[in-house]
């Protein structure tokens, strides 16, 4: 059985980690969010989140968005390639229901998985 935790090793923690992803990344986007991906040297994917106040105004809104993205990543982590992912929220992301956001994330995870596998 696969372990479905979201431990510290599955997160991008330092500004250098984020900088690497922003420099050369595959991009999958929608009007609501963008996911950047770049291969890493580890044997597992890692997740970073960028949710600007300018895009989602309230702290509960930003926290809700991050919680949903982390949960989607946690459930999909074993299907994802060994990439560093950064999810960037756009203004309209706060208007999506949980179900719509999960479906959108699934679609984008799948698209990035195909891109990185060739």
Curated annotation (Swiss-Prot):
User: Which E.C. number(s) belong to this protein?
Assistant: 3.1.26.5
Q: Name one Pfam family in it.
A: Ribonuclease_P
According to the record, the segments passing through the membrane are none
Q: Which UniProt keywords apply?
A: Endonuclease, Hydrolase, Nuclease, RNA-binding, tRNA processing
Which top EC class is given?
A: hydrolase
Q: Name one GO molecular function term.
A: tRNA binding
* Family recorded in the similarity comment: Belongs to the RnpA family.
Subunit description = Consists of a catalytic RNA component (M1 or rnpB) and a protein subunit.
Name of the protein in question: Ribonuclease P protein component
Source species, please?
Photobacterium profundum (strain SS9)
